[in-house]
Amino acid sequence: MAIKLAINGFGRIGRNIVRALYESGLSNEIKIVAINELADPEAIAHLLKYDTSHGRFFFPVKLGEDTISVAGDAIALFCEPNPAELPWKTLGVDVVLECTGVYHSREHAQLHLTAGAKKVLFSHPADNDVDATIVYGINDDELKPEHTIVSNGSCTTNCVVPVIKVLDDAFGIESGAITTIHASMNDQPVIDAYHHDLRRTRAASQSIIPVDTKLARGIDRILPKFKGRFEAIAVRVPTINVTAMDLSVTVNTDVDLNAVNNALKAQAKDRLEGILSYTAEPLVSIDFNHDPHSCIIDGTQTRVSHKRLIKLLVWCDNEWGFANRMLDTARAMVALEKITNIK
């Protein structure tokens, strides 16, 4: 029986989830049964079909009366500001993918459960009162059947945490520092405009812009042993997609460049296949656009100083990679419930 998903908020991540589902060939196993979005339906259909970052969607999209169809699959379309009023029970929704970026607490997620959904998965970091924060491939084994409200973390935690885990397992990490070099986002203006963050009042295409980040806190949630041992800063750069992470860690044992790259390459072919990738080609950010991995190591940029300080450059498509992990985590949540029901 197919997994039934609903998407609340059809922005960058919501639309990429639908595209990723159909491009991955999983649309028979997973069905999007509903989308709730306050925007104009014609704009919803148009932006699903045509995307500046990811190109044209080659599955047919048609807008109907209160529906949007993809490859002939009808998806109910709602414009409901109150999630508690959505017909999730009638539609048999297994998991709501909460992609508005507005809701972040257990109280907010409860609105979807009240409407009849079985589970909720946030597409962004949530408050501490959720059942779990998951970075797929690292701690998804901590999911439990009784977990009804889960966060998928952020694109940056999904990018950096697998790398930290590999390095710690191989060499033992003492501490670390990270600079996120992030593509522009939709909270930045095209030309100077008002914003509560004075740096984000400035035109996105004209500056490298420092922004606040809670990445270090996100690492603590996934890997509690590192609480207080990582610091992070972030800047936004004038590109529209693909992010780079400048990761520096000090380790407990002497290492060299080859040992570091070999450890990462080995895990990319083993336990973290599909999550972690490795390249030694002379690539630039656009080359990682539409890459489904959570993180891609640029082996040409690995550096080791005084045998114990490692510096890495890690790439990710902050939209496409994360959208794929949303599908992975949603599948895992439903699979656990089905196993429990069989027992």
UniProtKB/Swiss-Prot annotation:
One of its GO terms (cellular component) is cytoplasm. Pfam families: Gp_dh_C (PF02800), Gp_dh_N (PF00044). Substrate binds at S154, C155, T156, R200, T213, K214, R236. The keyword Cytoplasm applies. Its EC number is 1.2.1.72. This is D-erythrose-4-phosphate dehydrogenase. It is found in: Cytoplasm. The gene is epd. GO terms for molecular function: erythrose-4-phosphate dehydrogenase activity; NAD binding; NADP binding. Catalyzes the NAD-dependent conversion of D-erythrose 4-phosphate to 4-phosphoerythronate. One of its GO terms (biological process) is pyridoxine biosynthetic process.
